[in-house]
Amino acid sequence: MAVLAALLRGGARSRSPLLRRLVQEIRYVERSYVSKPTLKEVVIVSATRTPIGSFLGSLSLLPTTKLGSIAMQGAIEKAGIPKEEVKEAYMGNVLQGGEGQAPARQAVLGAGLPISTPRTTINKVCASGMKAIMMASQSLMCGHQDVMVAGGMESMSNVPYVMNRGSTPYGGVKLEDLIVKDGLTDVYNKIHMGSCAENTAKKLNIARDEQDAYAINSYTRSKAAWEAGKFGNEVIPVTVTVKGQPDVVVKEDEEYKRVDFSKVPKLKTVFQKENGTITAANASTLNDGAAALVLMTAGAAKRLNVTPLARIVAFADAAVEPIDFPIAPVHAVSMVLKDVGLKKEDIAMWEVNEAFSLVVLANIKMLEIDPQKVNINGGAVSLGHPIGMSGARIVGHLTHALKQGEYGLASICNGGGGASAMLIQKL
């Protein structure tokens, strides 16, 4: 090293071409190392959600943006910070038709945040809520902001029907349901998402009775979780005001109570009449709800004297053929585990969104993970699936359900063949 140092101190003319090249490379490496940025640690300091309402049920009088406002306000109050500390917000929302301009902006102002608070509405279909958390985390990691709110919201009860613009054709007009058109249809194969799931069931040889059994287990787990108070730290009550009537306070998810197990094996299949496997019982339902998390850098948490609940460890997106969307989480999860050097055995709890029972069974089968660690308190089949909310809901639930030091991995598929996954660690 001393000889090399002496050579480096020598004049340029005394160096051979090879040595000059070596000097340049060493200096380049040194500059690169010194200037390499360090990402900030991002923590979750609160995670709340509304109860999930059934389609045209208890929350149907509230628009998407109002549900978003309630979830945001609840998360900020739980965090115990002034609203002025929130510097930006991202909210997932899929079915935006008829909601008015900039739904996330409406939610932000409805929650009482300052007029100067920037906001962005995220649409990654069912993964929208999780993607909002991912994008907020990236902004915090790079130091662009230090306190943010992120989550997702959806009122499927309030999604309108639409008709094409133009002259009225002979025979009348045709109305289309935007829930189906913009939320539940594979635009590439021109089929319902359920038909895509049937394709996966056939490929992986996952029978109807397996899916029915999984659905019954989901309902059983959700009921047990509510009775044991497992959702107490995340669900905030929602007051619904009806003119001329007493206010109604909604405190619990509505969907898990609406099941008759004796009818589950008798239901007709919905998407494939012959040899089909998917029914109304083993698929998720149409629902209303919102979830929000307050995220900040570890430095901001210290500055604000806030105790973090969990830290964001890693996240990833993946994509496959659109028709194969049910297995896309397999790839996103694998990317996350590879990035952080963990094995599936290191994960204490898994949340795999139950768009269909088939989705969870397919991911358990392909990832070879322990079913007893997956969706231990139920999932979208029994709790409900407001599509813009669900990705945020499962991250928020892990935040509360994990024990100190444990890792939890949430994943969710989305239309078009995509998926998102996020790894957190309880603090």
UniProtKB/Swiss-Prot annotation:
N6-acetyllysine sites (modified residues): K66, K174, K181, K190, K202, K223, K230, K251, K257, K263, K273, K338
GO biological process assignments: fatty acid beta-oxidation
InterPro entries: Thiolase, Thiolase-like, Thiolase_acyl_enz_int_AS, Thiolase_AS, Thiolase_C, Thiolase_CS, Thiolase_N
Main location: mitochondrion
Residues carrying the site annotation Increases nucleophilicity of active site Cys: H385
Gene3D superfamilies in alphabetical order: 3.40.47.10
MF annotations from Gene Ontology: acetyl-CoA C-acetyltransferase activity; metal ion binding
Pfam family, one: Thiolase_C
Recorded metabolic or biological pathway in which this protein acts: Lipid metabolism; fatty acid beta-oxidation
SUPFAM superfamilies xrefs: Thiolase-like
Keyword Iron: no
Enzyme Commission identifier(s): 2.3.1.9
Cellular component annotations (GO), alphabetically ordered: mitochondrion
Keywords: Acetylation, Acyltransferase, Fatty acid metabolism, Lipid metabolism, Metal-binding, Mitochondrion, Potassium, Transferase, Transit peptide
Residue positions, PTM N6-succinyllysine: K66, K78, K174, K181, K190, K202, K223, K230, K243, K263, K266, K268
Changes after translation: Succinylation at Lys-268, adjacent to a coenzyme A binding site. Desuccinylated by SIRT5.
Reactions accelerated catalytically: 2 acetyl-CoA = acetoacetyl-CoA + CoA; propanoyl-CoA + acetyl-CoA = 2-methyl-3-oxobutanoyl-CoA + CoA
Residues annotated to bind K(+): Y219, A280, A281, A283, V381
Annotated transit peptide: 1-33
Assigned protein family: Belongs to the thiolase-like superfamily. Thiolase family.
Function of the protein: This is one of the enzymes that catalyzes the last step of the mitochondrial beta-oxidation pathway, an aerobic process breaking down fatty acids into acetyl-CoA. Using free coenzyme A/CoA, catalyzes the thiolytic cleavage of medium- to long-chain 3-oxoacyl-CoAs into acetyl-CoA and a fatty acyl-CoA shortened by two carbon atoms. The activity of the enzyme is reversible and it can also catalyze the condensation of two acetyl-CoA molecules into acetoacetyl-CoA. Thereby, it plays a major role in ketone body metabolism.
Quaternary data: Homotetramer.
Protein name in the entry: Acetyl-CoA acetyltransferase, mitochondrial
The organism of origin for this protein: Macaca fascicularis (Crab-eating macaque)
